[in-house]
Amino acid sequence: MKKNLRTASICVQGGYEPKNGEPIEVPIYQSTTFKYDNSEEMAMLFDLKKEGYFYSRLQNPTNDVVAKKIAELEGGVGAVLTSSGQAANFYAVFNIANCGDHVVASSTIYGGTFNLFGVTLKKLGIECTFVNPNDSEEEIQKAFRPNTKVVFGETISNPGCAVLDIEKFARIAHKNGVPLIVDNTFATPINCRPFEWGADIVTHSTTKYMDGTASQVGGVVVDSGNFDWMAHADKFPGLCTPDDSYHGLTYVKAFGKMGYTTKLVAQLMRDLGSIPAPMNSFILNLGLQSLHLRMRQHCANAQKVAEFLQNDERVAWVHYSGLEGDEYHALAQKYMPNGTCGVIAFGLKGDRETAIKFMDSLDMINIVTHVADARTCVLHPASHTHRQLSEEQLKEAGVAPDLIRLSVGIEDVEDILDDIKQALDQI
């Protein structure tokens, strides 16, 4: 077993240890089911008394190898791949919270997640209070209720590029006896490992930087194994009391630090599905092998682009925490001293139509919903990803009407700058 590998080596070789004569690349187990020689062996799998595979809706060897690699990158004890980042965030919360429960979440999060927490979870009987992440601990504490079960935030918010004070949010969550979930999609474990700052569970849309090529849609939930569920057993009956659907098994008692991820697979994957296809996981693993190299280039290119935008008189404002004058620069230096990500938020002087004209004038840079892959792309969140929100909700989410989200890729930075310059000349 490979031990104590550094981050770059985990990207390349983590999660998979081929034996003598086996393929060097992770095999694709494109099979729905798995054969056993006797009935008793399969019965033990269904009772969770034996490790193994019997149906790919629950677990698949290809998926598990890639999940293990991501867990190693984040410093977690276990991980579960999902079919999308949205599924990962839903499962991470729904594995803890039930009908009648409450969630506290940062207001500066991705529009789809904002809607998931504010609308969809509400239909399931789970209410959410959104808080300004820049507020004091005392102010955020006011959002908590006796039935609060989890706190949620994004390391770097999408699309506003705000940096979460992870230690502060972890401190507040733990004071109230609940775990902190952090969506680490934009920073990736290359630039930030939230578990080292007190987070308990990490999620990703693996569709983004981890994949890097816009070739597959996926997500992942990673557990640190650090949260003491039994110390707050009254809050988390699903983890700390017998499960009637598994002959009275209690997940935390039976599986210890793996209790959270085991429950996620045994209950949520069993009942709701959302497992990725093995081929998608294979593609994701190819992306992970170069993640450390790509993030370095994303950050270097984004820094140069942000500095250019900051100095152009046609630009009204720029949010990129790599800039010394940015309001989140100090937090970025604390949590991500080696770089943040390739995403920049900025606004042009003028109105919403000015932003649209600029985007329509771009040549090499693509207008797409996607973000955080090898290609440089651009989006106007108020018109696209967040268009379902009201003006008040847009303000609460930190999405200004003039905000342009620029995801800087790994092309030659001079070509990126040339395209931005010619588009600015046309507004």
Model-identified regions with their sequence ranges:
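Conserved small-domain helix->loop->beta segment predominantly found in fold-type I
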Residues: 272-275, 279-281, 286, 290, ...
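Conserved N-terminal alpha-helix of the aminotransferase class I/II PLP-enzyme fold
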Residues: 38-90, 112-120
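Glycine-centered tight turns that cap/initiate beta-strands
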Residues: 75, 147, 314-317, 364, ...
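N-terminal "arm"/small-domain region of PLP-dependent enzymes with the aminotransferase-like
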Residues: 1-60, 68
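PLP-dependent enzyme catalytic core of the Aspartate aminotransferase-like
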Residues: 118-119, 127-128, 142, 146-149, ...
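Conserved PLP-enzyme active-site core in the AAT-like
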Residues: 2, 8-17, 79-311
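Glycine-rich beta-alpha junction loops
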Residues: 16, 30-36, 225-226, 288-290, ...
